Amino acid sequence: MAKDLNVFDKEYGLLINGVWTKPGALLDSYNPANGEVLAKFTDATDADVDAAVAAAQEAFKTWRKTTTTERAAILNKIADVIDDNLELFALQETLDNGKPIRETRAADIPLASDHFRYFASVIRGEEGTATQLDSEDLSIVLREPIGVVGQIIPWNFPFLMAAWKIAPALAAGCTIVIHPSSSTSLSLLSFAQKINQLLPKGVLNIITGRGSKSGEYMLRHKGFNKLAFTGSTEIGRHIGIAAAEMLIPATLELGGKSANIFFDDMPFDKALEGAQKGILFNQGQVCCAGSRIFVQEGIYDKFVNALAEEFKKIKVGLPWEDDTQMGSQVNAGQLETILKYVKIGEQEGCRIITGGKKIEGALGKGEFVEPTLIEADSNNARVAQEEIFGPVATVIKFKTEEEVIKMANDSEYGLGGAVWSKDINRCLRVSNALETGRVWVNCYNRLPAGAPFGGYKTSGIGRETHKMMLAAYTQVKNIYISTREEREGFY
C-alpha cells in the first residue's frame, strides 16, 4: 500500500507571539527525492524579525520567573507530543530533507524527544552556591537566564537540531527566535503547530526565509542576548563576528573532517558497519561524518575490499520507503558539490574505489549519488582535508599508532572521530591524543543527550547535548552580603 505523502499544509506563515501570521511572500520547499513542491513557506521581512524579537522580549519578563518545576513539566509535555506523533514527524522530516525514514524513525525523532526529557530532568537539579567568606560576609552565586536567544539551525538535521537548541534554552528560562534553513523549514513549522499551545505567547517564535535576508538581519539585531548556530565553519565565523560586535556570547557547532581509525585488531564485522555508519548516515551530510578512513596496513586490503563490497550493496532509494538505506542529498547544489570533489580527487591522482556518480534511471529526478570510496596516498589531498558533506570517504593506509595520530590531527577541524581496536589501552591512548571534541570507541555517530558534543579548532565554540548547555544560556549573578552592622571605618 502506497504511503500518503500529503502531510504538510499548502502554505505556512510565521509563528510570532503565539500566533501564526498570514503567509506573506512565499518560497517553495522541495522534496529532494523527486523535485516536487511539498509546500510554500514565508520569506520573512525585517519587520517580521522585529516583531518576533519584541514578542520574545516581552515574554521573557514572565517566562524567566517560572519555576524549574513548571519549565520541566512543559518540556516533558513537548516530549510527549513528539512521541505521540513519531510516525508523522519522521515522514515529514524524511520528505523535507531526503534522509531515509528508517533513520528519522529510529534516530532523529526519538533523539529529539530524549533531548527534551533530558533537560526537563537536569534543570530540576540545578543549584546555586553560597560561600561564607568570613564570619560576617556571605557570597551567593545564582544563574539567571541570559535573555532572548537567536538560533539558526541547519538543513541536515532540522528537527533534531531544533531540539538541541530549543530544549536547553527553554529549560534555562530564555525566550527564542529560531530560524531554520530555507531548504528544510517544514518539519520545524509542523512541530511548532503541535506544541504552540503548550508555551506562553512569545516564548518560541519562528522566522523562516532566506538566510541572506532574514537570517542576516537577525545577526544585526540589537535585541538578542545570545546567538546559537549549527552549520558551516565559514558562516560560523560570520556569526561569531556579529556576536562579538554586539558583545554577546555565541555557541557555534561547525564543520568537521573526522578521522575514523581502524587498527589491525579491530572487531572486523562491527567495524565494517561502523565505517558505513560514519559516512553513509544521512547521506554523509553530518558535521562529524567519518569522512577520513585510516586503516592499518596489516588489514588494509581485506578491510577496504570488504568495505567497497558493502558500499555496493547499499540500497539507495526513495527515502520514504522502509527498506531504503540511503536517500537523496538535500538539494541539487549539494549534489553538485559532491560530484565536484570526486573530480578533484581524480585530478589529484586519487583512485575511485567505488561509486562517485549521480544515480539516474528511476531515481533520476532526485538528488541521488552513489556511496563513494576514494583511496588517497596522502592526507594532504583536498578530499582528505576539505569538508565534502556527502557519502564520500577518503581511505588512507597507515603503519603505526604515532603516524595515524599525526595524520588525524593534521586538519583544521576537530569535531568527531573514532578508534576501532580490541586493545582498550590503545583506544584510550589514541583517544587522548586526538585533537577533537568527540571520540567514539568501537562505535560511531551515537548522539544521545547527556554526552557533550562540540568541536576543537575551527569546528566550533561551546558544547551541546549536555547539562553544561544550561551555563551557556544563563549568566552569573553574585549577591554579596555583609552582616556587619558597624561602619567599616574607611570614611
Predicted regions span which residues?
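Short, well-ordered beta-strand elements within core beta-sheets of diverse protein domains
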Residues: 37-44, 58-65, 151, 260-263, ...
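Rossmann-like NAD(P) dinucleotide-binding subdomain of oxidoreductase/dehydrogenase enzymes
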Residues: 128-270, 398
